[in-house]
Amino acid sequence: VMETKHTLLEALGIELKECSKERCVAVMPVDERTRQPFGYLHGGASVALAETVASIGAYQHIDPKEQACFGLEINANHIKSVKDGTVKAVATPLHVGKSTMVFQIDIRDEQDSLICTSRCTMAVISRPSS
């Protein structure tokens, strides 16, 4: 179980729904926490959601006692705007290697329309021995 208290996940209202080695799913509200000044979902909130599901997805492939993973690169194409409701992100691994992983993330609105597509590269590092 991952602790999310006092994290960006808590601040943005991101909730993890499912996660396995094959896919990771989370939802995020479109509300005062995630909108930009014109009332639409902020692109940065979408990117934060995308990196969240990629990071948690990558975590499924490592030994957390021996390794850690961090976002190395992320890109996003914002396809459609959203004013309210909830968006859902699904991350699937495209590459799972020893030192890097690449995830494809699609974010959809409540009508299942694609609103953002993203690709995130994760770095895998060894934890220092204590």
Feature names for model-found ranges:
Residues 1-130:
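Terminal targeting signals and extreme-terminal segments of soluble enzymes
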